[in-house]
């Protein structure tokens, strides 16, 4: 029951029909109808789902994949069975059974040829599914109410219908709030500040409208009579409003797409099988078939469901070397969409034959004995008859399908173990054209130290689906990790040619160009990246660093500022590494100092030092203080400059960075000399700097040694005394009270 149906004109009355005491409202038995048909088991199963999904992730996934064979797949087949198993039904819905089916088949072929279509088709399936669930819940609610003789008035029906529609709109707002975390699900990117109050209003409307309608129904009947109606309304709340209610009350975000798929699909499917099995039984009995069997019907649905979902992706993948993962999703989406369309056409209570079977089980179907005598009917009767050949064909077909399903289950079990290398290898042997398996295999081989094999698996994943951007970028990053920079450069060059507007690929391509010495090309690609996405923080940072190295300090500062603003805007959701942020803060302060923005420069250096202290980044805290000291000296704040140098040197004492420490002591010595402090302190600091660099030869040591010699010459004979105890003077220098001359 996939649509929110309208009542027949003759039933739209302003006064309620009196309840009938002769009609039985139940389909099977009260406990089965309430539990399965009305969804009373939703709450305990959803709670169990949250627990097991977190505690037993792999087992829970496998359980769902197996349940798909018993409920999800058969429920699709139930619709196919209903519309294709007789000539009358086939012709009645010909536009759906033939024309729509052919259009969807063409869409499937196009999607296999053009991967970019898959996200659109898959998003349509994801967004249509909740509407389908809503329509079924509402249709069953109306069925139970009318079977109990408590037909809702037009106002009551409208209130219930609008409340159910409101719950669906609420769910769609949740789906389309913010960016999508799944490449296959497109989002409108609505702002939470707009959707949150809208969702709250829709939730209140659902409670108010449905509450009023249910209260009105209760007044003219009794609680037991409308218990199925109450239960279905509660089920709609659990399926659609509960996540929003949790988010509104606690502020904890729940992924609605995950919540609304998986277990909800199983609950919906079992509900569908419950009502269709009743309908098929009543229809068969009305047509004079006294041999109808639920077990035979269920086996038919299971076998047919397997045929709908499993062979197609395997055949396309193995024969045409298409990506099994993409093919499976394509078949899943299109079979679902066809099911939604068919379901909306065939399940309408205004159809007199459906109403006769679902609302009044005593009436006869007008279809009884009306089967056309033609070749289609004859073939159908032979295939379903008792002839040995027909029976053997049925058994053989079912056996093949069940074996195929078993192989598919085994493939899923092996591929779901992310760290079990032998299992993943067996899954890859079953189907080497499965990009998902190849990616997991690559990760497992990387962990096992088999780097060449891991890279080969990633290459297979990328080659089996060249239109998948994520796979191509993953392969490119794998090449970088393997040190094959030239190959990675070529790979990202291909990616840019196919996806010129992908900011991440432009950033990686620019980085590779820089590492291979193509600096102009690197800057060009980073500029393209920030043009595509100004919030691409890495591109802003790399571009700033490149411009800084070229001496374009102010141009670099502009990009540093954008980088810092971007990081600050998303820090709560995606904290960045503190090192680049601190370095950027210092660079921006340097740029402010260069153009005499003294207040901004001072705040920038102080902020960098304070942030570094809180983050435990001692090296960068020292660097910020040294830059601050140099700035303070230029601003004639000699006392402040001395204190900044001394704080930096005290921090350096706890670091193991001889070059930076020696450089800071050298700069402090030069500062003391410029401020005409006693030469013995200058010499002691230079001697200390030189001693730190003794085991680190290079240009720094040469410069420091030259400065020490010049200071020693100025100091004369007193230098000998300093050499005997340089440590004492070094310690004293950290407490000098240096003031302006």
Residue ranges and their predicted role:
Residues 420, 454, 488, 522, ...:
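Single-residue signature of alpha-solenoid repeat helices
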Residues 427, 460-461, 494-495, 528-529, ...:
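Canonical positions in the second alpha-helix
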Residues 447, 481-482, 515-516, 549, ...:
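Register position in tetratricopeptide repeats
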């Amino acid at each position: 029951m996939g649509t929110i149906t309208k009542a027949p004109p003759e039933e739209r009355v302003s006064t309620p029909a009196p309840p009938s005491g002769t009609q039985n409202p139940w389909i099977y038995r009260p406990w089965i109808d309430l539990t399965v048909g009305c969804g009373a088991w939703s709450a305990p199963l959803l709670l169990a789902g949250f627990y097991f999904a977190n505690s037993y992730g792999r087992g829970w996934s496998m359980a769902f994949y197996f349940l798909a064979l018993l409920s999800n797949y058969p429920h699709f087949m139930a619709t196919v069975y209903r519309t294709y198993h007789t000539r009358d039904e086939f012709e009645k819905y010909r536009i759906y059974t033939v024309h729509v089916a052919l259009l969807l088949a063409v869409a499937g072929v196009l999607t296999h040829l053009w991967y970019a279509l898959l996200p659109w088709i898959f998003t349509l399936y994801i967004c249509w599914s909740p509407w389908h669930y809503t329509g079924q819940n509402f249709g069953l609610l109306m069925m139970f109410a009318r079977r109990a003789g408590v037909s809702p008035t037009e106002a009551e029906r409208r209130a219930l219908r609008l409340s159910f529609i409101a719950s669906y709109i609420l769910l769609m707002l949740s789906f389309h709030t913010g960016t999508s975390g799944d490449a296959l699900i497109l989002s409108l990117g609505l702002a939470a500040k707009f959707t949150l109050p809208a969702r709250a209003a829709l939730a209140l409307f659902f409670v108010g409208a449905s509450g009023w309608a249910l209260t009105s129904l209760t007044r003219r009947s009794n609680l037991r009579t409308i218990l199925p109606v109450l239960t279905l309304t509660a089920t709609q709340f659990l399926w659609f409003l509960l996540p929003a209610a949790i988010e509104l009350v606690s502020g904890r975000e729940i992924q609605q797409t995950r919540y609304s798929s998986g277990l909800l699909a199983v609950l919906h499917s079992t509900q569908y099988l419950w009502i269709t099995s009743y309908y098929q039984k009543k229809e068969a009995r009305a047509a004079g078939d006294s041999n109808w069997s639920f077990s035979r019907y269920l086996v038919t649905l299971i076998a047919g469901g397997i045929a709908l979902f499993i062979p197609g992706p395997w055949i396309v993948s193995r024969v045409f070397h298409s990506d099994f993962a993409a093919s499976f999703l394509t078949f899943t989406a299109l079979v679902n969409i066809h099911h939604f369309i068919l379901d909306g056409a065939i399940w309408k209570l205004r159809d007199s034959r459906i109403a006769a079977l679902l609302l009044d089980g005593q009436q006869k179907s007008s279809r009884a004995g009306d089967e056309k005598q033609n070749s289609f009917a004859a073939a159908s009767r032979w295939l379903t008859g008792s002839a040995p050949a027909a029976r053997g064909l049925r058994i053989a077909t079912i056996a093949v399908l069940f074996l195929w399903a078993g192989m598919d289950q085994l493939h899923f079990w092996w591929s779901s173990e992310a760290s079990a290398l032998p299992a993943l290898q067996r899954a890859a042997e079953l189907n080497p054209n499965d990009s998902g398996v190849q990616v997991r295999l690559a990760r497992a081989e990387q962990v096992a130290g088999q780097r060449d094999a891991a890279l080969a698996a990633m290459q297979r994943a990328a080659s089996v689906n060249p239109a998948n951007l994520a796979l191509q970028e993953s392969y490119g990053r794998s090449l970088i990790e393997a040190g094959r920079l030239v190959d990675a450069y070529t790979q990202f060059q291909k990616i840019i040619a196919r996806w010129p507007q992908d900011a991440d690929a432009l950033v990686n391509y620019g980085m590779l160009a820089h590492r291979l010495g193509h600096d102009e090309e690197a800057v060009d690609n980073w500029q393209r990246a920030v043009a595509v996405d100004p919030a691409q923080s890495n591109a802003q940072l790399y571009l700033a660093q490149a411009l800084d190295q070229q001496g374009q300090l102010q141009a670099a500062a502009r990009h540093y500022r954008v980088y810092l603003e971007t990081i600050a805007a998303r820090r709560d959701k995606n904290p960045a590494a503190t090192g680049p942020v601190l370095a950027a803060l210092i660079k921006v302060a340097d740029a402010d100092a260069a153009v005499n923005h003294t207040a901004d420069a001072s705040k920038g250096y102080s902020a960098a030092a304070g942030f570094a202290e809180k983050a435990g980044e001692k090296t960068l805290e020292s660097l910020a203080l040294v830059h601050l000291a140099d700035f303070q000296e230029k601003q004639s704040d000699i006392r402040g400059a001395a204190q900044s140098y001394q704080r930096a040197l005290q921090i350096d004492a706890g670091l193991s960075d001889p070059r930076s420490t020696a450089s800071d002591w050298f700069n402090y010595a030069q500062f003391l000399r410029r401020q005409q402090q006693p030469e013995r302190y200058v010499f002691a600091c230079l001697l200390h700097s030189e001693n730190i660099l003794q085991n680190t030869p290079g240009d720094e040591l040469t410069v420091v040694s030259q400065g020490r010699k010049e200071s020693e010459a100025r100091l004369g004979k007193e230098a000998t005394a300093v050499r005997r105890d340089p440590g004492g003077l070094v310690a004293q220098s950290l407490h000098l009270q240096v003031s302006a001359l």
